Amino acid sequence: MSEARTAIVTGSTSGIGLGIARAFAAQGMNLMLNGFGAPADIEKERQAIIDEFHVKALYSPADMTKPQEITEMVTAAHAQLGAVDVLVNNAGIQFVAPIEEFPPEKWDQILAINLSAAFHAMRAAVPLMKAQKFGRIINIASAHALVASPFKSAYVAAKHGIAGLTKTVALEVAEAGITVNAICPGYVLTPLVEKQIPDTAKARGITEAQVVHDVLLDAQPTKRFVTVEEIGALAVFLTTPLAGSITGAILSIDGGWTAH
């Protein structure tokens, strides 16, 4: 059982982030959700969490490219929920193209959302966690924090950066009751992955079906997508007392991808 009672999960209006938020809510944690999407859809998911798990579920529209909004989100969570026990940096976007065709503005946007946002959120949350002598920071990286794939220069660079940032902050807060870890999923059939299938097909000159079978699942010896529920269960475990000695870890959950 987790001793954490409150959690911020960025990028939690769909996909992996929503799965983690729901897994936390099932443990009785109150939540600060964050992400983009149709307001009606976001409100539907927020209310579903409240109704199903009987927890508080707030929503912040903070833009992960704007440091001040990220800081204000953390401050609001602390003020309205009473603490920030867990921070999950999950927000992420993707773009697929050869480097000579990669738009510089896409590079900047991916680095801002996939890497810098985690820095700004941790910078705001760590003092609050130090004050209560407890905290769990979970950065959602990727198998691409450990290996590379062509045509994903910004994403791979950002995820490798998340791995380094995770280790550095873990060392800084090791005696403060705070753990910092990165979860590195393989391919999960989320909206983010589904959106990149056509781009990958175009970049490689193959069909979308071939992308799924020969590119995505080819990397994973289990030949199946990792599930959101599996990632949520690992995230929950990292918040429990039994995970207190796990820190600075880069944890693969990738169907054997990085065992190659």
PLM segments and residue spans:
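Conserved glycine-rich cofactor-binding loop
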Residues: T13-G15
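C-terminal substrate-recognition "lid" of short-chain dehydrogenase/reductases
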Residues: L81, F119-M122, F134, T222-I253, ...
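Substrate-binding pocket helix/loop in short-chain dehydrogenase/reductase
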Residues: P98-I99, K106-L111, I137, L216
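Active-site helix of classical SDR
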Residues: M122, A158, T166
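Alpha-helical segment proximal to the catalytic Tyr-Lys
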Residues: P127, L171-E172, G244
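Residue(s) in the substrate-gating loop at a strand-loop-helix junction
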Residues: S142
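Short, small/polar-rich loop/turn modules that mediate ligand/substrate recognition or access, typified
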Residues: A174, T179, I246-G248
